[in-house]
Amino acid sequence: MNKSRQAALYELPTKLQNSKEELGKILEEEEEYYKYISEKFKYSKRAKESEEVVGQMQEAYKLIDEAIDILMKYLLIDYT
């Protein structure tokens, strides 16, 4: 494996973790917005859309977390 590819692989978990943290912050804000919208406009299209966005963001957050775990296992197995 060439050195630039190896370096990129080692940087990837950090980049994914940073993305996960950013997504976590945005997710918190979106969850607060969803709570507000769902209380104020219980059955509106806007509340439903917000609920869907929160669900998709939660799923993305879980997938990023799983990707970090898998990548770290790969790096530890391959390069130690």
Question: Can you say where each PLM-predicted feature lies in the sequence?
Answer:
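Long, low-complexity or tandemly repetitive, helically biased scaffold regions used
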Residues: 1-80
